Amino acid sequence: MEELCAALAGGVALAAPNSPAAPHPRLSAYKGRGDRLGQAERRRRLLCLQRERRLDYVNHARRLAEGDWAGVESDEDGGEDGDGEEEMEVDAGRRLPKRYANQLMLSEWLVDVPVDLEQEWIVVVCPVGKRALVVASRGSTAAYTKSGFCVNRFPSLLPGGNRHNTMNEKVYCILDCIYNEAEQTYYILDVMCWRGHPVYDCQTDFRFFWLSSKIQEEEGLGEKSRINPYKFVGLQNFPCTSESLCEVLTTNFPFEVDGLLFYHKQTHYTPGSTPLVGWLRPYMVPDILGLTVPATPLTAKPDYAGRQLQQIIESKRSKKLAAGKAQPSAEAAARNGHYELEHLSTPQPANSAQGQEEAGSQMEN
């Protein structure tokens, strides 16, 4: 477990380069501290590393499902992550040690377009919502924030998720979801464990295929009921060919679209930010990927996109006046610039008071 914890901690350290908490590097004049190795090179190194490394994900999944951390040094929950994204009201009694923090695989901005994008990548269209770690085990289903706080506990028709479908303690599920409060729906983005079988070290294309087939086997999972008060709905994935992406951008999805996640097919599920998962807003696709796409509601640039550069300039100017520095840090700019923050909601229209204050992304990419 010590090796696994160290590896997971290393994965989180990748969050700085090209973080979606700041503007897309190719769509603004703001210069962060940069990506010294380059996104393409870091992708290559991570693919090599995951082939060489085999971690004890069986035991890790069991600990998450059962909450059994005996024999593991406690990482007590003193202090927050410091990035202020968790504004939910969480009962002090429901706070857990940081074991459940940083368990989700997060993206970076897609900056260096992969040369093998069409052959080796797949894309998932993501609804507006909050990322959630969902654990169904021992007759109950729990939803955790990225920071590891339990914000909901309820029955579900997930294997191990309610008292009626839990035959033994080895039946449990661990899912990466996007929760949409308005729809009372958990959109299943990825799977880490199903019926006690961990798939952390399986490739993305297999995980997605396996997840889709397992969801279809669970009757009633996509409907609200007394023992399934929240719907669980799988998200489709698509090829990254030019034709497929154009078709995706003209599709009328049954939810409000937040953005696109691009997954390398060979990516293992690794907690923390990784260049093997890229994030783009739909309107960015023509500029970043160089595609000619039809004019649709998804590809229309929102008002806040044009305001980003001005916000960055104003943020820099205020920082110079306040601290006498040449340029603010990426973290400070993200706090003060009010642009595409990683953990806030997709901005309201420009005439909305809330929209003028917060132009960001609700999904923790």
Curated annotation (Swiss-Prot):
InterPro entries: Importin-a_IBB (IPR002652), Snurportin-1 (IPR017336), Snurportin-1_N (IPR024721), Snurportin1_C (IPR047857). GO terms for molecular function: nuclear import signal receptor activity; RNA binding. Residues 73-90 have a biased composition (Acidic residues). One of its GO terms (biological process) is RNA import into nucleus. PROSITE patterns: IBB. Residues 129-131 are annotated as: Interaction with m3G-cap structure. Keywords: Cytoplasm, Nucleus, RNA-binding, Transport. Its main location: nucleus. Residues 211-333 are annotated as: Necessary for binding to the m3G-cap structure. SUPFAM superfamilies: DNA ligase/mRNA capping enzyme, catalytic domain (SSF56091). It is found in: Nucleus; Cytoplasm. Pfam families: Snurportin1 (PF11538), SPN1_m3Gcap_bd (PF21974). It comes from the Eukaryota. Residues 345-355 have a biased composition (Polar residues). Residues 15-34, 69-90, 317-365 are annotated as: Disordered. The record marks 107, 146, 279 as: Interaction with m3G-cap structure. Residues 10-72 form the IBB domain. GO terms for cellular component: cytosol; NLS-dependent protein nuclear import complex; nucleoplasm; nucleus; plasma membrane. Belongs to the snurportin family. Functions as an U snRNP-specific nuclear import adapter. Involved in the trimethylguanosine (m3G)-cap-dependent nuclear import of U snRNPs. Binds specifically to the terminal m3G-cap U snRNAs. This is Snurportin-1. It comes from Gallus gallus.
